[in-house]
Regions:
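Core catalytic lobe of class I
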Residues: 1-184
Length: 184
């Protein structure tokens, strides 16, 4: 790691962020291993899931004889809110890229018993799927060819994440701002 890239002490960071965040707000942080594992475990209670940013420009060429080139970065999502559909404290999540589609779907409920285990039942339930194109965990955004800062993120990636976790007019805090991409 670079000298300027120091780890913010986790306990103090989470204490301050938990005072600032709305009950259903998201805290979205970038990191690579082994840092991302330490970050995740520092607040496993509020950890929700990861995205993977697939970069178009790799890193680690000086060590290519010893390890694979690195073409991704982890994006960790934390929240005081829940990730359940009908929970009143549901974390803000506005999936991007959805397409309207009213389509009748059917699923089989599951039966379970101690002898056979879980298996599909004969009971089928119909529902209407209203959208399609839900995001996958891998986000593909081109790396910047000319960077102001060594860890600079593409504006399009930051815009995607902001639109996913906030509503129009809400405030975003970038407390790890390097080159200021979030403010653009």
């Amino acid at each position: 790691a670079c000298k300027w890239d120091s780890v913010i002490p986790f306990p103090e960071m989470w204490e301050r962020l938990n005072k600032l965040i709305k009950p259903n707000g998201a805290i979205v942080l970038f990191g690579s291993e082994p840092f991302s594992s330490a970050l995740r475990m520092s607040n496993i209670k509020n950890y929700k899931y990861d995205w993977v940013w697939e970069k178009s420009k790799g890193a680690g060429f000086l060590n290519a004889k010893n390890a694979p080139l690195k073409y991704h970065e982890n994006i960790l999502v934390f929240s005081l809110g829940k990730t359940a559909n009908n929970n009143k404290n549901r974390m803000e999540y506005n999936p991007q890229g959805l397409v309207n589609e009213k389509r009748l779907r059917t699923y089989s409920e599951k039966d379970s018993n101690t002898v056979i285990g879980t298996r599909p039942s004969r009971k089928k339930t119909n529902y209407i799927q209203e959208k399609k194109g839900y995001p996958k965990t891998i986000l593909k955004f081109n790396s910047l060819l000319k960077q102001i800062h060594p860890t600079q993120k593409p504006v399009a990636l930051m815009e995607y994440l902001i639109k996913t976790y906030t509503n129009e007019g809400e405030t975003v805090l970038d407390f790890t701002m390097g080159s200021g991409t979030t403010g653009v």
